[in-house]
């Protein structure tokens, strides 16, 4: 019999808050994290704004030498993990280190370090490349650093699946605990891609909104006038724990993870199958895994990137999977506020889904002003959070390469 898995800790570094409480308050209030880029001189770029993390100090959670040898994405991961472990009440001696694992991914990894060291190579030659460059750059190092931080000696690896990365991480953590290979997993993702190469590359493929005169209204998922996503960054970390282990130590339980399914489009490098058929399979599979009907889900945190094709395809997919229940489910894209956090997006959105259950509130899709007929007549929770019962929530993620993930979390009941 599969073991039950619950959520006992949450941590986040986002463009709208450097902890979970601040982030969640901002989401409920409909606060946009978008503003002009400050991390580099973007004055010559076609896109000059992003959703940056603000006021982040890695020295609050890392020693100076450790922080110096870690890329920004890994610093974000450590900070969010420290919050999540404290939130879960997991202090040394409380958990079995051999039964505690880490699954933390990144869509791109240490891009900031790569760009900086490439400049060093071009300007000063090979001999001046930092000996720490490779471990700072690779996408698995956040998982490694976090495992060392907490002496977690169980399963330890990184998922890398573009914008589905941290949803895969949470799903794999769920399965790992279900099947008995660990009792606790620190799971999620981190990203730090407000850099010249990332902004330039995504802008050149016309994936980004170019509303430079109005950053705060640029991310507008499902709106007729949407013109691309807004780059985000940060980290989301979720502590998953086997139910009886959590109960034995008197842990607070946010919710129970009950469904996970991953699928592939096998279709296009950056586009989705028509009607997001691959995501439909992920949603149906996650609901089947949970043993739930669509009408038992009250909230869907959509992938909702604010790009033309994704949003219309995803809306169609939700309508097809939910059928008659699609008219009563609350749907929103929190990317309208955080921007697209790439490899960290799925975890932050799973956190929002979990808190929606706890607090009985659906966060809004901000900047939704003009309905798009291609997105149908679904309830995208426009512009204001809505109080409502949320018994269960489904969170969608999709990534370049055709990676789709759906996760289902529900209210915990003994």
Predicted regions, residues:
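Short, well-ordered amphipathic alpha-helical segments that serve as non-catalytic structural scaffolds
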Residues: 77-88, 142, 169, 241-243, ...
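Conserved catalytic cysteine-centered active-site region
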Residues: 1-2, 36-79, 99, 109-172, ...
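Glycine-/small-residue-rich "gating" segment that lines the acyl/pantetheine channel
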Residues: 123-130, 168-171, 175, 191-248, ...
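Condensing-enzyme catalytic core mediating Claisen C-C bond formation in acyl metabolism
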Residues: 4-8, 32-35, 213-290, 299, ...
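Acyl-CoA/ACP chain-elongation machinery
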Residues: 181-227, 260-274, 304-311, 328-378
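Active-site-proximal alpha-helical scaffold in enzymes
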Residues: 77-90, 139, 147-191, 229-251, ...
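Phosphate/pyrophosphate-binding loops at sites that engage ATP/ADP/AMP, CoA/4′-phosphopantetheine
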Residues: 84-96, 246-253, 283-299, 321-325
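ACP-dependent fatty acid/polyketide chain-elongation machinery
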Residues: 1-66, 88, 244-254, 351-365, ...
